[in-house]
Amino acid sequence: MMSIKLTLCALIFFLLNSLLHHVLGHDNQLNTTSSWLKSHIKAATTTNWGRPKPPMCKPWICKRSGPSEARMRCCRNQCVDVLSDPNHCRFCFKSCRFALSCCDGDCVDTNTDPSNCGQCGNECESGAPCEFGMCGYAAPSSQPGKRHRRHKFHRPRPPPSPDSKLNYDDHDDE
């Protein structure tokens, strides 16, 4: 009995609501967006919520305006240098891990890489290690093949005591 009453109330409400909208001439507004929402949607697409929207990027514009065609790509409507940008290293959206740099499209550790020591393109001399971003830092020696040795510290010996001298003259008499 209760479900019949609820169904009847819902049907009456629906019919009255439809009649009201038809009489007032609001038939079309049931499926439209409010003017407030329209203005906020328009503001969001044009100003990016207060920040200026980046210029539209077409792939051929990036290639013409950048240093070379191989370097510039259109990623998320921005022209980026994919050979040096750590957020777009070689490909759009390929990010380098923390503390790695993008050098010629590869994610490298400039603290240990001898080809990119300290910065991209800084190559260490042959055989010199790259440590802490410096070529040859704490290297054993500047000359290959020779090891740097610390001089051994020798304490000065005390002078011999007069009692400890041997008398060799006494032994010669025999």
UniProtKB/Swiss-Prot annotation:
Comp. bias intervals (Basic residues): 145-157
UniProt entry tagged with the keyword Transmembrane helix: no
Gene Ontology CC entries for this record: extracellular region
Spans annotated as Disordered: 140-174
Covalent S-S links between cysteines: none
The organism's place on the tree of life at top rank: Eukaryota
One matching Pfam family: Stig1
InterPro entries named in the record: Stig-like (IPR006969)
Subcellular location: Secreted
Keywords, ordered alphabetically: Developmental protein, Secreted, Signal
Major location category of this protein: secreted
GO biological process: cuticle development; embryo development ending in seed dormancy; seed development
Disruption phenotype: Increased embryonic cuticule permeability. Altered cotyledon development. Cup-shaped cotyledons.
Signal peptide: 1-25
PANTHER family noted in UniProt: STIGMA-SPECIFIC STIG1-LIKE PROTEIN 3, STIGMA-SPECIFIC STIG1-LIKE PROTEIN 4
Similarity remark: Belongs to the STIG1 family.
Stated role: Endosperm-specific cysteine-rich protein that acts downstream of BHLH95/ZOU to modify the interface between embryo and endosperm and mediate the separation of these two tissues during seed development. Necessary for the biogenesis of the embryo sheath, an extracuticular endosperm-derived structure at the surface of the embryo. Required for the separation of embryo and endosperm, and for normal progression of the embryo through the endosperm tissue. Required for the formation of a normal embryonic cuticle.
Name the UniProt record assigns to this protein: Stigma-specific STIG1-like protein 4
Taxonomic placement: Eukaryota, Viridiplantae, Streptophyta, Embryophyta, Tracheophyta
